[in-house]
Amino acid sequence: MPVLETEEEGRAYCAARCSTESLTKLELFGELLAEENTRQNLIARDSLKTIWVRHFADSIQLLTHVPRETTGPWLDLGTGAGLPGLVIAIARPDMSVILVENRRKRIEWLQNVTAGIGLQNVTIEGKKVEAVASMAATVISARAFAPLPKLLQLSTRFSTDATYWVLPKGRSAVQELETEEQAGLHGMFHVERSVTDADARILVGRGRPSYL
């Protein structure tokens, strides 16, 4: 599909993939995010003007790369402001979502937002990824968290042969993937275009890396 360019297009994209209740919660999340961003740097200030495209649609598009019947757990590493994890949890209230974040102020904010919006499907792991207990995640996501080699090193223990990986990347996606394939990843991932940025890509994969 064409790249989303306006906030109206971004909101319409989200509305087509969310219930009315979820869309209302996204609006509230946006208000809370803008307010908190005056106290701590959760997202780039300029991106608040394009929050529906840059953050909400950018997160919701990840759902198109996993089966609709998937109910989790969805593990979001280095969630930061809750992107994409909180957006996924809002859009899919039937999906169990686990947010991993190490920074104290952000942990507190995620806890407050989760309670304020009334999300019952979110668990917050307020610690480093290395300290999170091993689990079998159905989906693993990470936005601007770490280069692919380090990401896989940290997160492979959360994966199974059936795990889906959805990893938003910028222009480096192809290069990162080629590096890992040379190291023995053997076609586990492929590259998808982002609907929110002509230069951005998403690494999509399934399984458990076997070379680590």
Predicted features by range, described:
Residues 96, 121-123, 164, 187-190:
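Conserved beta-strand segments of alpha/beta enzyme cores
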Residues 1-75, 105-122:
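Class I SAM-dependent transferase core
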Residues 49, 129-130, 190-194:
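Short, solvent-exposed loop/turn elements at beta->coil junctions and helix N-caps
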Residues 171-212:
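Active-site capping/gating segments
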Residues 102, 145, 168-172:
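Short strand-turn motif at the edge of the Rossmann-like AdoMet-binding core
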Residues 148-149:
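Short glycine-rich, flexible loops that bind phosphorylated cofactors or substrates
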Residues 57-142, 152-153:
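Conserved SAM/SAH cofactor-binding pocket of Class I
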Residues 152-165:
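A short glycine-rich, Lys/Arg-flanked "PGG" loop and its adjoining helix->strand segment in the class I
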